[in-house]
Amino acid sequence: MLLIAGLGNPGSHYQNNRHNIGFMAVDAIHEAFSFSPWSKKFQAEVSNGLINGEKILLIKPQTFMNLSGQAIGEALRFYKLDLDHLIVFYDELDLPPGTVRVKIGGRSNGHNGIKSIDSHCGNNYHHVRLGIGRPISKELVDQYVLGNFTQSDQKWLSTLLGVIANNVAMLIKGDSNCFMNKISLTMKSQGLQ
């Protein structure tokens, strides 16, 4: 079994925020495959399904971003899963919009959701960083990540979410380089990178 987490903040007020791109990625995966309806467990919304025969638990912590590790830690302990069975999708300021980078382990780079997971679980899991770009001024970071994606963002965003869902099986079988390459080629072929 693998646990695929998307980070974000709960509630309709935050639904379209840049900070919620992790939730959006997991929602796209949920829609692309025959997953169970969302239910509440582990201080999160969860859904079970199969991707290429692999059991998957999708999880969207409902604890707010800064406490995401509580929900993810509960789920890992309940299912007795090691960190190599955890994939986390989240927003990354230091990557251009529509860019994806996957790595195992590493630092939080100031991302409070990742800091929370690292403190509750450790950091040796699959980090899937989804580029949202960065505002011009450092003082505007909070306002930027908690701001909604703009109309001009919608084309690259919808394409990115679709290509993530269509190719997540590569990531699940451990081929993160092919996953990143497929996303990059798709985004570039459509002039979105």
Swiss-Prot record:
InterPro entries documented for this protein: Pept_tRNA_hydro, Pept_tRNA_hydro_CS, Pept_tRNA_hydro_sf
Enzyme type, top EC level: hydrolase
Biological processes annotated in GO: protein quality control for misfolded or incompletely synthesized proteins; rescue of stalled ribosome
Active site, per annotation: H19
Cellular localization per UniProt: Cytoplasm
Binding site for tRNA: Y14, F64, N66, N112
This enzyme's EC code(s): 3.1.1.29
Keywords: Cytoplasm, Hydrolase, RNA-binding, tRNA-binding
Site (Stabilizes the basic form of H active site to accept a proton): D91
Residue numbers marked as site, Discriminates between blocked and unblocked aminoacyl-tRNA: N9
Any single GO CC term annotated in Swiss-Prot or TrEMBL for this entry: cytoplasm
Catalytic activity as recorded in UniProt: an N-acyl-L-alpha-aminoacyl-tRNA + H2O = an N-acyl-L-amino acid + a tRNA + H(+)
Function in brief: Hydrolyzes ribosome-free peptidyl-tRNAs (with 1 or more amino acids incorporated), which drop off the ribosome during protein synthesis, or as a result of ribosome stalling.
Matching NCBIfam families: pth
HAMAP family named in the record: Pept_tRNA_hydro_bact
Family: Belongs to the PTH family.
Protein name: Peptidyl-tRNA hydrolase
Organism: Bartonella bacilliformis (strain ATCC 35685 / KC583 / Herrer 020/F12,63)
Gene: pth
